Amino acid sequence: YQMRAYGSGGANRGDDYGIPSIQMISDMCGEDVMNNGSGWYLYNYNYWGETQANIFRTDQLWTFHYRLVNNLNSVITYVDDSEGEDMDKQYIKGQALALRGWAYFDLARLYQQTYAIAKDMPGVPIYTEPTVDGTQGKPRGTLEETYQQILSDLTTAESRLEGFVRSSSYPNVFDQTVVQGVLSQVYQVMNNWAKSEEYAKKVLAVYPLTTAEEYANGFNDHLTKSWIWGIKQTEEQNMGDYSPFAMWYNGDRKCWTFAGFILSVQCVDLFDEDEIRFK
């Protein structure tokens, strides 16, 4: 299923365009971004959008992730019996497991407090087989059980993707290093600092940090060393206004989607002009 297409979460709104929109929503829910009371993301800033079941936002988040999980479950279930080389099928299954682990990791962070204080509290429903409209829904289980599934998916994917080399034209595809990066994040949330550091070092061994000079040149090249998972946009691809690139336009502070989600002058004034963050 397209992970960056308009309406991929079922909300069919200009701020419903898959993983990039969910990343924007998550940014607005954090403590380091503020909203001035306008724009769509106000409803995320005040947590209204995530906690009310009768409005578009929580339905968008829930639908996108579980629609993705269900499609991945079909791949995981049936790929072994499909035609093709065994190694190719191993890699495909590894990528599906990795993305399913990522999806449950995202759901766990959206619908429960952090693992360190909430592992015995409700997690999210876990589905590992394809479902249809009449499938009986599953209970939430505990957050610890959710993280057990996340780790199972990601560690299995890590081993299955051994030796897989992705094309630079498709940075959206999981390879082993991307899986290790997600595992580092998962262990960090679980406060398992040693494992988080171990996996972060594995990533850094393959993708060195961006230099200060490269950092100052901007973020328009998906081949920049620090970018290990992303979307390559080509001139032939055009989703019009319903795209992350239209949504991220911030040249006009009166832009209808972003009036409340733009770097303030007061924030810019905190940094010296010679500092890398200012540049």
Locations of regions flagged by a protein language model:
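Second-shell loop/turn segments in exported
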Residues: I55-W62, E83-E85, D133-L143, S169-Y170
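Short coil/linker segments at helix-helix boundaries
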Residues: L110-E144, Q148, S152
